[in-house]
Amino acid sequence: MREYHIYKIREDVALDYYGMETKLFQLFQENREAKGRLKEATEKQIQYIIQQVNKVEIQDHLNKYLRETEGYIMRDNKHYIMSPKRNSQAGLCIYKMHIKLFSEGSQDSEACFFEALRNYDGTFIAMDFSREQYGWLKPLKSLEIAELSESNKAFK
């Protein structure tokens, strides 16, 4: 089973750390293993760079975005996509400071959740600590380029 912890990173931090996802992952990984003062220090750093997740907004967005997806259900404020034909299933839970995604089988169901979250906000980063995999759900360079082109329009 794959398990992803998904965090909403402050936009200024996300732009500064584009291409340096490894540093963010190392901070979160170190926090998971740390004790004592190191745990406190890494916890403060993490609290500074992440933003609270708006549970109600994301619930609504997922319901609208995934409503037509085969095998999608929402039960007890948890979201599931089960696709036996594709040997794929995933579940998503939204917490105050992060989102947790579990999946088994092929990656089709988890990809649906990632796409829905990417569509909601461009500053999510997903981390699978057991497999040491991580990455932005949306390429931030496209976000940065869009912002630059918007600011250039103001000068025209």
Regions found by a protein language model. Give the residues of each.
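Acidic (Asp/Glu-rich) sequence patches and key acidic residues
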Residues: M1-M97, D108-E115, F129-K156
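A common structural junction motif
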Residues: L117-F124
